[in-house]
Amino acid sequence: MANKYAGTQTEKNLEAAFAGESQARNKYTYFASKAKKEGFEQIAALFLKTADNEKEHAKLWFKELNGIGDTAENLAAAADGENYEWTDMYEGFAVTAEKEGFPALAAKFRMVAAIEKHHEERYRALLKNVEMQEVFKKSEVKIWECRNCGHIVVGTAAPEICPVCAHPQSYFEVNAENY
């Protein structure tokens, strides 16, 4: 996923624009939640509307940086990002927090790092499924569920088309009930 701006100030500007728009989007969704809790529905809705605008602005800059590949590339990039977060970023933050007298925050950084590790593992497992063409076909019998209508199929593969709602195979997932 090379980009034509590599090594330029424009690349740095695009990265900063992407980061700024991404952060604004998240802040505005948090602000919307607070406004809603305080009884300001219109203000909450406007924060969410603006957050959606910021998401689209961020997408413009991310696309310019060729940040969106195919699903396999995106899974690999996501796994790499999560790996950095749990192996380097959060551990470094934890060490600094401890040195500066914030042991509770250091512990929280490490707990989040453990979550990021799980995210990496999940993305790598999904990437393996994509690469092995095992997203919709397994070697063992599985229970498949249509994410649109809930239709259940038992077998080694999800159907090409849901016989109930006619949605494509892409709507099926292995059923995983944990309750």
Describe every region a protein language model picked out.
Residues 1-179:
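Non-heme di-metal
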